[in-house]
Amino acid sequence: MSRKFCVGGNWKMNGDQKSIAEIAKTLSSAALDPNTEVVIGCPAIYLMYARNLLPCELGLAGQNAYKVAKGAFTGEISPAMLKDIGADWVILGHSERRAIFGESDALIAEKAEHALAEGLKVIACIGETLEEREAGKTNEVVARQMCAYAQKIKDWKNVVVAYEPVWAIGTGKTATPDQAQEVHAFLRQWLSDNISKEVSASLRIQYGGSVTAANAKELAKKPDIDGFLVGGASLKPEFVDIINARQ
């Protein structure tokens, strides 16, 4: 089964109107691979601004959302609000949400369940720390994180999983294409054993750990890598080369 390549750009807490206009201009004028789905994860307050400037075929994602539709949750944003201003995706479970904001596997899974029920597509992030990798616990950690999602997600068609080795985020360290493929292959097998062979064959698994124009082409050749979740490089013109890594 062929899985459509999917590249997400996670701008994190970066950007202002001027820089977003510049990025939008770069993406609008570039020849982007029509066989690659592109999703931009923009700071929530700029989502509507970005939607008006970005090419309409690009998806737009919130970087977080809460597990209920509305209520007394100061500072939080709901999937319904994201949809209302033009987002069609949300990134959930990013390692920074887990590490800095203390989000648990269970909370992230509840967020994913609610976002899907509200009609958003979800980029569901997983990944291990350097300490966990060096202790040989990579598979154990990503299986635990997937297990939490699986308890809440019954229909996977609007889900993309992003494997981000935390030790390779913003550190300049990158998992080699072989290291990345090894974990992606494990995840594919886990899906086959624990969800279904159909989901294993169709679910897209992105790689997200210091992806650059320099390493994207090699990573994109791997059979179980179906795209990227790109951090810092998605704010730069080289993001176009990453989107076109399969060409």
From Swiss-Prot:
Record's subunit section: Homodimer.
GO-annotated molecular function: triose-phosphate isomerase activity
This protein's UniProt keywords: Gluconeogenesis, Glycolysis, Isomerase
Annotated consequence of substituting residue 142 to M: In strain: Ds-NA
UniProt-listed CDD domains: TIM
Gene that encodes the chain: Tpi
NCBIfam families reported for this sequence: tim (TIGR00419)
Official protein name in the record: Triosephosphate isomerase
Family: Belongs to the triosephosphate isomerase family.
Signal peptide location: none
An annotated GO BP: glyceraldehyde-3-phosphate metabolic process
EC number: 5.3.1.1
Keyword check for Isomerase: yes
SUPFAM superfamilies (alphabetical): Triosephosphate isomerase (TIM)
Catalytic activities: D-glyceraldehyde 3-phosphate = dihydroxyacetone phosphate
